[in-house]
Amino acid sequence: MAHRRYADVVGTLAILGGTGAQGMGLALRFAAAGESIVIGSRVLERARDAAARVRAAVPAAQVDGLENLDAAALAERIVLVLPVDGLDAFLGSAGPHLAGKLVIDAMVPLQVRKRVAELVAVGDASSVSELVQSRVPAARVVCAFKNVPSDALQDLARRLEGDVLLCSDDDGARREVATLVEHVPGLRPVDAGPLRLARYVEGLTALLVTMNIRHKALTSIAIVGL
């Protein structure tokens, strides 16, 4: 039997809102790990430009750029790194493209005031992940990649360190994301329980960002004892 590449087996991964710092960092790391990537943006030209930058950094990368809705329709696996203030409206229009699919929420609703990062309210939900699940009930939502600093993700010469906390009410979806995490050198997936605990994962990010500001560092999470 002919050998099949990893990207051919798992299919395309769409990163919606992928032109920002976190999205670009994830696109670079996933492309380097052999994923077939589509970067989504509200503006097609920005998506194509981001895809070109990934190809320049990872010459063998399979990456394209599309508008967010087109990227969501194309892929079976979705990563959300969209601006939180427009998320509710986006989910209203994109819901049919997300239903039944693996949806990885990597968003954190942060604001920084006087060098202190804090969470901001996200509609009627206690976390962004729970908001996504409530708006698209048929999506297989997993909270992941919320505590990995974007600057570290974007620096391919830097080996990542830390654990990726995974919260979900879908055990199969959590396992799929764990496999994705394992393909990124230096990261370890950790089952952190049901989706309702995503609020605490998001809170950890506020703490990490504040420490990064105070100590001029790039901190991440590592769980000892596991």
Give a label for each model feature.
Residues V116-A125, Q154-G172:
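Short beta-strand and adjoining strand-loop segment in the mid-core
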Residues G11, K101, G162:
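Nucleotide donor/acceptor-binding cores
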Residues A2-R53, H183:
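NAD(P)+-binding Rossmann beta1-loop-alpha1 motif at the extreme N-terminus of oxidoreductases
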